[in-house]
Structure formats: C-alpha cells, structure tokens
From Swiss-Prot:
Listed pathway(s): Nucleotide-sugar biosynthesis; ADP-L-glycero-beta-D-manno-heptose biosynthesis; ADP-L-glycero-beta-D-manno-heptose from D-glycero-beta-D-manno-heptose 7-phosphate: step 1/4; Nucleotide-sugar biosynthesis; ADP-L-glycero-beta-D-manno-heptose biosynthesis; ADP-L-glycero-beta-D-manno-heptose from D-glycero-beta-D-manno-heptose 7-phosphate: step 3/4
Record-annotated active site: D264
GO cellular component, one term: cytosol
Subunit structure: Homodimer.
UniProt function note: Catalyzes the ADP transfer from ATP to D-glycero-beta-D-manno-heptose 1-phosphate, yielding ADP-D-glycero-beta-D-manno-heptose.
Binding site for ATP: N195, M196, S197, E198
Any GO BP: ADP-L-glycero-beta-D-manno-heptose biosynthetic process
Source organism: Vibrio cholerae serotype O1 (strain ATCC 39541 / Classical Ogawa 395 / O395)
Protein name in UniProt: Bifunctional protein HldE
Length: 476
C-alpha cells in the first residue's frame, strides 16, 4: 500500500498533554574522572528541542499542519524556551503556567553518538483544576479536526476522561498515546496507540499474531474504543477496528539509531492525516512510514513531507505525490540545486481524460520534474459555475498523483495560480491552449527570474465539458 500524501495544510490538530523540554549536551570523552569511575565529557555543543506532547505539535507543524497545544508548565526559563521554539514553528501555544512546579526538562549527555546519562528535572503535576484545560479546549475545538492526548504520566492528563468527553461532545475524534496499564482512564477514545510492551502490560504476554488480534479486539470491547493501533517495533504495526479485518503493516525502518520520540511521530502523522481527510488505514500506513524515518535520526526528531514522501515511495527519485505549498517550495529548491529542470502547469482536471494525460506526458518530457497545481473546489465553482467540480479536490489530486508523468500535485484556492507560481518559480511554466506566453498567469514572474514560458496544444476531441454532456445525454 503506497498512500498519497494529503494536503496537511488542511489539518487542524489540538494536542493536550505533558509538554517538556529536551536538552542535549554533546562532546568527546577520552578519560576517566579521578573523582569516580565515570567518563569525563568535554561539552562542545548543546541543543534544545520540544519534547513529549510538544514534540507531537512540532511533528504536525513540520508537515505543514496547524497545531494548537495545551499543556502545563512552570513559570521559568525552560517554559519560555519551549514556547519560543514552538511559536517559531507556527505552533499555537496555550500553556497553563503554574508557579509551584518546574517545567519538565530532560537533559541528555552524549558522546560519539552514544547517550551516557539522562538527568530529569520534574515534579508531577497533581490536584490541578480540570477547568484550566477544559476552558482552553472549548475555545480550540471548533477550529480543529482531531485531538491528540499525549500522556507521559506527568499530570497534565489527570482529568483525561473529562477531556475525552469534551472532544467527543464536539464531534472531534480523540487519539491517545497511552501511558501505564490503566486503560480504563481512556474509555471511549477513538483510537489508542500503545506500543507492544504497553499492550502486554494490560493483556499479558502475547505469543502470536492471532493472540494479539484476539486480545486487541477484547480491549476494544472492554473499554469502548473506536480502534487500536499496536506499534510492534521490528514487527511493524497492527490496526484493529470494529467490524473490520486486522490491518498489519511491516516495519519500514532501514536502520534504528534512536527510538526517542518515535511514538510521538506515529500519533502526530496519524492524526494529521485523518484531519486532512485520509481514511484510518491510509493514515496508519503514512504513520508507519514516518516512524521508519524518525528512528534513523538522533534524539527527538520530526519528519518533513519530503522525507515522508520519499519513505512512502521508496526513493528520492520517485514521485512525491500531493504536497503542501511550503513543502513544495523546499522540494523545488532541492531539485534545482541538483541541476534538475522543474516544469509547472495548472488546471482544474475535473474529469481526467486522454487529452489531459497526453498533455501532462508532453509537459513532463520538457524537464526533470513536473508540478501540477490544481484549483480547489471553491476555485473551480467560481470558474466553471454551479455543478462543478464533479470530483472533489482530494480525488482530483489523488488521480493526478498516480500518473507516472507527475511528480508533485499542489492545490491553490485563488482564481489563478499567479501567487503560487511566483512563490515556486519553476524553470519552465507550460499551459495548454491558444494563449500568448505573456498572457499566462505567473508567466511574467517566471521570465523575470530567468525561466521560460511555453504553450502546448491540447489533443483535439477531448473535453471535460463534452464528457459531462455525453453522460447527461446517456451517451457515456
């Protein structure tokens, strides 16, 4: 299964959970301390990254999604660092700062790629007022399509049942990364994502895949869950849904370097994909691919849409599929830096026909990469009138992304793609029809940047309008 990446700019996700700051100190070690039998590390580099629920938010932002995070912090320097880092990534931070607690901070000391020690600075948040988070959730829920509850057992989800019910009352699915063996706390969740050890802590030792499936379905019934995704390390993932066959996904990790934050990546990509319109099985396939990427990195890491597309398609030289504007700009820069000629075209492509395919094949032959910009449903309706489009934006983009000639598919909501083309600046802009180059939207900007504009002929006898009329007349 090779799913097409959705447009993550449509994904609004609310994250509620245990936020923390991950700090890393790096340096060489070449001697043992005379004070105790421990290595001496000469710290030469340091780094700070959002961790826990904050890493989930960072993952969603790196995909181009809209992340809104609610969590508990102290009134201290780590809280300011955490908020500043997330805000710089366009994450909306809504922290509850409590004066009697420190912001959870984890300091890791590494040498030659190996973690030597971790130091935790934390006190569990206890007896907090649920309304502090519930009131913030109430304001955020109308703006999102998914909720993630990220539980590290640090106290932010002390009132987790109230949070689940608040989201369900708003009609928003709730995805939970659980902690501990008390799954009763998560009753009614749309999806739980335990790893294998967390799963076995609840159901007992699992000796076979069949036993995993049986015990998993029993958990779904017992705790009134919508679905269960068990992450199984080198054995991949298993998705269990009410009334459906088990869905097994093999691991995509080529090399495991560090599993820190892998669970955060799984739930963030899964929830963002569902929020962007993907079915649960496709979202799990994307999350599985993302996990394979992130375990190959050191420390708490994120996955970009470029990396995710490469993981899904198996190579940096294969089609990337549907992509957000920000990710496309990044991808085009990389392609042009490699000396590749990027070609761009645009259209509604409402009912894809032989004329479209011929045109796109011709366009692809003019360069190394082909971008197709697609009018959104609202844009098509303004241009073509009531009753159009026949196919939704997601379906039109999915079909285009499946063509061998097409590398990237990106949506735009305006009447013309002029702004988008000016942001992308392809090497060659092509358009079908009888236009003059200077009349083509975005043409002036491309030429001013040193690019070219070319008009291609459409194949005669192929027209979306004619196809629609033929179907209406019963000639289809």
């Amino acid at each position: 299964m090779k799913p097409v990446l959705p447009d993550y700019s449509k994904a609004g996700v609310l994250i509620v959970g245990d936020v923390m700051l991950d700090r890393y100190w790096y340096g060489p070690t070449g001697r043992i301390s005379p004070e105790a039998p421990v290595p001496v590390v000469k710290v030469e580099q340091s780094e700070e990254r959002p961790g826990g629920a904050a890493n989930v938010a960072m993952n969603i932002a790196s995909l181009g999604g809209h992340a809104h995070i609610i969590g508990l912090t102290g009134q201290d320097e780590p809280a300011n660092v955490l908020a500043n880092k997330l805000t710089s990534l366009k994450v909306h931070c809504d922290f509850v700062a409590l004066p009697d607690y420190p912001t959870i901070t984890k300091l890791r000391v590494l040498s030659r790629g190996q973690q030597l020690i971790r130091l935790d600075f934390e006190d569990k948040f206890e007896n907090t007022d649920a309304q502090l988070i519930l009131s913030r959730m109430e304001s955020a829920l109308p703006k999102v399509r998914a909720v993630i509850l990220s539980d590290y057992a640090k106290g932010a989800l002390e009132h987790v049942q109230q949070f689940i019910q608040k989201a369900k009352a708003a009609g928003v699915p709730v995805f939970i990364d659980p902690k501990g063996s008390d799954f009763e706390r998560y009753r009614g969740a749309s999806l739980l994502t335990p790893n294998m050890s967390e799963f076995e802590a609840v159901v007992g030792k699992v000796k076979s895949e069949q036993e995993l499936v049986e015990k998993g379905f029993a958990l779904i019934e017992k705790f009134d869950l919508g679905a269960l995704l068990v992450t199984r390390s080198e054995h991949g993932m298993t998705l269990l849904r009410r009334g459906l066959e088990p869905f097994h996904l093999p691991t995509q990790a080529k090399e495991v370097y560090d599993v820190t934050g892998a669970g955060d990546t799984v739930i963030s990509v899964l929830a963002a994909s569902v929020a962007a319109g993907k079915a649960l099985d496709e979202a799990c396939a994307l999350a599985n691919a993302a996990a394979g990427v992130v375990v190959g990195k050191l420390g708490t890491s994120t996955v970009s849409t470029i990396e995710l597309a490469e993981a899904v398609h198996g190579s940096k030289d294969t089609d990337y599929g549907v992509i957000s504007e920000d990710a496309l700009i990044e991808a085009v820069k990389k392609a042009q830096a490699r000396g590749e000629k990027v070609v761009m075209t645009n259209g509604c492509f409402d009912i894809l026909h032989a004329g479209h395919v011929s045109y796109l094949n011709h366009a692809a032959e003019l360069g190394d990469r082909l971008i197709v910009a697609v009018n959104t449903d609202e844009s098509v309706k303004r241009l073509k009138g009531p009753g159009r489009p026949v196919n939704s934006t997601d379906r039109r983009m999915a079909v285009l992304a499946g063509l061998g000639a097409v590398d990237w598919v990106v949506p735009f909501s305006e009447d013309t793609p002029q702004r988008l083309i000016a942001a992308i600046l392809p090497n060659l802009l092509v358009k079908g029809g009888d236009y003059k180059p200077e009349e083509i939207a975005g043409g002036k900007e491309v030429i001013a940047a040193g690019g070219e504009v070319k008009v291609l002929n459409f194949e005669e006898g192929c027209s979306t309008t004619e196809i629609i009329e033929a179907i209406k007349g019963g000639r289809g």
